[in-house]
């Protein structure tokens, strides 16, 4: 659903306006006519609140309109997002690497059209859920900004003494393994790689590699470790890190990653800060290889302001409270999204 009165839409220059086009009317639908993912072929948006604006359907889209006045405003966008409709699209979409549909393909598909009163109720419910999801997204983003501001102001923008990461912790290199070491056996050693890391998040263990190779004792991840991407073809990804919250004693890291191990509770937030990112950037300058990389000394030589113990306790309490709120609000977001997905599967035939 796109609200033309409030959502930001792209504009085109007058000199590239096509000679022939059809302007959107209230309730018209735009379908994606091609995608590399069958789930996104015929992905649809319904346009609301046009208010006389000159809006056209863009490249690789199909402009749809209810010419028989069988539907109410707001219903079509959800009907065309339903599981029932997309099952039909996946069956008829053509292509190998890129899948596509044509206007003629829509003659082979259908959506349920209940009474207009029933359509209005369905649209009202799903619009309300979408608005709540949007509100939840804003709450989450605001909490992230608040946490980041506290880290920058109370942990990084302080004068006085400083300390190096090497003063309060150690660095451990990742495990080197060969392709033949990789296995499907989930009892084998779990390898965490760069794709499992993201600033401000815990290590994501959903897509991991299992290997028949035993890491050293120090290479086994422990709860509280910080996993760092040390080398990557994209310099923007070098230095990204995540906190390891598990105590499974079965996981290690790949050769392009490293472990920073410390008992200092502030470090995991310092390593999300702009000060940390600037030091990563400075360490990468002068490299001339195809792969941007850090070494252990680059991490251990990074410096940050030294915070008094009494002050640090109150900062820890505040940031942990924000992180708990983030966890709760992300969970609530997933529940709303799950509810919407369930309704899109069950309410349309």
Question: What kind of region is each of these model predictions?
Answer:
Residues 38-46, 235-242:
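Short, Lys/Arg- and Gly-enriched loop/turn segments at beta-strand edges
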Residues 121-127, 131, 138, 316-317, ...:
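Acidic/polar-enriched heptad-repeat coiled-coil alpha-helices
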Residues 108-116, 153-175, 301, 306:
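Non-catalytic DNA-recognition/assembly elements of restriction-modification systems
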Residues 128-131, 135-164, 331-349:
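Short amphipathic coiled-coil heptad-repeat segments
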Residues 54-62, 71, 83-86, 90-117, ...:
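A short glycine-rich beta-alpha junction/loop motif
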Residues 1-30, 166-181, 195-226, 248-249:
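Sequence-specific dsDNA recognition surfaces
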